């Protein structure tokens, strides 16, 4: 079993950001990046806060904390003026670098924002506080309001809610809803937020709810406020009067500025990757190796399949890197391994899913070393040919994943590792295979070996939006992760694995959550403690 790490939640706020927008304040967003083998990789980002030079971000940033590793982090603040996810066309308001260890040991760390080394971003600062996520429970709530005060001269109010928890003698933002335009009787979208972040895990923690009218210049008008606790919010249908303190003092017959009604409020367990793995889910690992002619003659030192005097090449290095991590999650350590794009004996027909051990009824290899041995033995026995077709192997693994899904339990998940030297040939068939597989307990990892153009692979990765078939059917979720091997060839071997496997836990959990499947063995529920409602 791999080492279990602690999940840390980072809350971010900034002060005195420089203004890049003419006539208004910036619309800041915070991006968190981590140093991965000398390259900065984005982990997550907060929401955008409109027209604010001292934002307190509602969305937290979550990261796994490894005591044994120096985890270098970079926080980037950007002024977002468009809807594209890319940041290259947005103004950079400043950044700061530190390690996660620094934040954890300080609990709250304030750093000056820098435009570049030696050049401060005005008086801008960033404050990051860390909180260990010990509780996997989430608060799920659905809220509406009725008869809110009209705040806009030419229209109705544009209301939104903010929930603040009391802590360290001040009110800390826990959640902010979306804005409902021009509506005095709004219903906000259902939302979920971690119990720890919402109320520190304590159902009796004072909660302040503020209802405000959104203004594009950032000068939001207070409609009303009320105080409560999560325990009271759970007593649905719960109704609270929104009171404007100044109106209450000025007007003798003032009653309220509207009411907020909690339609649903539940505390639910949000299972993690470790919950599923430790609950008994097996991760089934399958390997597919590219034996197309573009790799070059294996006997030539220029070939990607050429085995060096030490018996390795890029294919084997990538296989070891990823396989050595994944094999810890498979109890029998028997892995099916296939080749594709080669002419195979005895009839020398081109095959796109031949067993590396030439035993189609039992293609399993004992451990990663077994795959390596089968690869080395197969190499001189096949003729490299083509084309580069992925669909047959993806569909092969998908058939097993479909059988597992029929059990309707979180018992198995499938990871297919494809090692290839070039662009896929059967693009349409592969897109359809991936879209079909996205409905199954399965992920696909593609490692590009060599220096070819891998643009088509980036399309399969679909980071810019859901992958679609030619007929327009969209993938149910993103299940493909592609990386070119040579980006990591000078980095420690574990760096490649960390990158290509980074999305698998999220992909696995998203599938099981969508199906509504709990871990086979549910984790113990928290006992009596701060997260329990007060006793009468």
Swiss-Prot record:
Binding site for Ca(2+) 3: 152, 158, 213, 215
Pfam families according to UniProt: C2, Copine
Gene Ontology terms, MF aspect: calcium ion binding; calcium-dependent phospholipid binding; phosphatidylserine binding
Chief subcellular location: nucleus
Residues that hold Ca(2+) 4 according to the record: 152, 213, 215, 221
Compartments reported by the entry: Nucleus; Cytoplasm; Cell membrane
Protein's UniProt keywords contain Iron: no
InterPro entries the UniProt entry points to: C2_dom (IPR000008), C2_domain_sf (IPR035892), C2B_Copine (IPR037768), Copine (IPR045052), Copine_C (IPR010734), VWF_A (IPR002035), vWFA_dom_sf (IPR036465)
Keyword terms: Acetylation, Calcium, Cell membrane, Cytoplasm, Differentiation, Membrane, Metal-binding, Nucleus, Repeat, Repressor, Transcription, Transcription regulation
Tree of life domain: Eukaryota
Keyword Cytoplasm assigned: yes
Residue span(s) of domain VWFA: 284-504
Residues bound to Ca(2+) 1: 21, 27, 79, 81
Function: Calcium-dependent phospholipid-binding protein that plays a role in calcium-mediated intracellular processes. Involved in the TNF-alpha receptor signaling pathway in a calcium-dependent manner. Exhibits calcium-dependent phospholipid binding properties. Plays a role in neuronal progenitor cell differentiation; induces neurite outgrowth via a AKT-dependent signaling cascade and calcium-independent manner. May recruit target proteins to the cell membrane in a calcium-dependent manner. May function in membrane trafficking.
Identification of the protein by name: Copine-1
Organism: Mus musculus (Mouse)
Organism classification: Eukaryota, Metazoa, Chordata, Craniata, Vertebrata
